[in-house]
């Protein structure tokens, strides 16, 4: 079984805190960390979004002060503050979710995307290497590696196969630095041709698969996990996962039965 614990433009420091939070209730054998975050700015509007969905704990409180901007902290420390003039439109569901949290996700953290963006060319993503930022991110990658070692978890830093990628030079730097930390690094763009991806139907935008591409990559990734001696967990909630399979299958069948919809996504999503 697996779960997606990722948000938009998730930085490496936030990934560290997300991992600690996840491991407070879960015992993963392996974690995959998307390495593009090594080049993200230390702050963007997505930092608040990513922190908002974390349960209350030190793993949310610490990055609220170290990663969020000063004007975002009040809304993160006191979430109802963020409602401002919307108080009279709040429902019991709003309060209960804030207090009790959310129900189990029927897609285990995955976002089902059925629209497609036809891709014409594969390009380098225009990252600018900022040494101070990269160095800080590398320190957090080292903290992730150390935490995983304590918990007997295999960490795998990887690049998702897509059509807007870090340059060969930056990819080589990632490989060298992750190997220096003694952790696995996989560039799945190297397996791009093996995935039998259709550039006209399998991407939502230049950076993300839709469900068609995700199915192909997931099958490839599942077969590769066997290389690490991993086997499916026998401790999972079988009924919950069967329901998730039924839910995903229903969405897939509905999308497969109709024409391919265009996503209208921009050429270079931010």
Where are these regions (language model features)?
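Active-site-proximal beta-strand/loop segments in catalytic clefts of secreted hydrolases
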Residues: 5-8, 34-36, 158-162, 188-191, ...
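Acidic-and-aromatic substrate-binding clefts and catalytic sites of carbohydrate-active enzymes
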Residues: 9-13, 133-135, 161-170
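Extracytoplasmic/secreted proteins, especially bacterial periplasmic and envelope-associated proteins
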Residues: 14-17, 60, 73-82, 136-143, ...
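Sec-exported extracytoplasmic/periplasmic mature domains
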Residues: 20, 24, 146-150, 222, ...
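Loop/turn elements at helix/coil->beta-strand transitions in domains of secreted/extracellular proteins
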Residues: 27-30, 149-156, 181-184
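Secreted/periplasmic serine-hydrolase-like ester/acetyl group-modifying domain
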Residues: 46-154, 234-270
């Amino acid at each position: 079984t697996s779960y997606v614990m990722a948000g938009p433009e998730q930085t490496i420091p936030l990934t560290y805190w997300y991992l600690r939070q996840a491991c407070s209730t879960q015992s993963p054998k392996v974690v995959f960390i998307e390495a593009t975050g090594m080049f993200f700015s230390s702050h963007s509007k997505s930092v608040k979004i990513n922190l908002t969905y974390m349960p209350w704990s030190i793993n949310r409180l610490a990055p609220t002060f170290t990663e969020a901007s000063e004007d975002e902290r009040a809304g993160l420390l006191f979430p109802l503050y963020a409602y401002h003039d919307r108080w009279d439109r709040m429902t019991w569901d709003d309060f209960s979710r804030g207090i009790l949290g959310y129900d189990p996700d029927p897609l285990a953290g995955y976002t089902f995307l059925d629209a497609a963006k036809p891709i014409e060319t594969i390009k380098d993503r225009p990252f600018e290497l900022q040494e101070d930022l990269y160095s800080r991110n590398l320190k957090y990658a080292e903290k992730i590696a150390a935490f995983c070692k304590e918990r007997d978890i295999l960490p795998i830093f990887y690049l998702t196969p897509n059509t807007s990628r870090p340059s060969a030079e930056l990819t080589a730097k990632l490989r060298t630095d992750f190997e220096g930390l003694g952790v696995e690094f996989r560039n799945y763009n190297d397996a791009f041709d093996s995935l039998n991806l259709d550039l006209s139907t399998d991407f939502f935008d230049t950076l993300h698969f839709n469900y068609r591409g995700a199915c192909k990559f997931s099958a490839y990734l599942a077969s590769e996990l066997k290389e690490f001696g991993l086997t499916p967990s026998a401790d999972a909630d079988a009924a919950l996962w069967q329901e998730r399979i039924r839910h995903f299958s229903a969405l897939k069948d509905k999308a497969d039965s109709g024409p391919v919809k265009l996503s209208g996504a921009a050429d270079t999503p931010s």
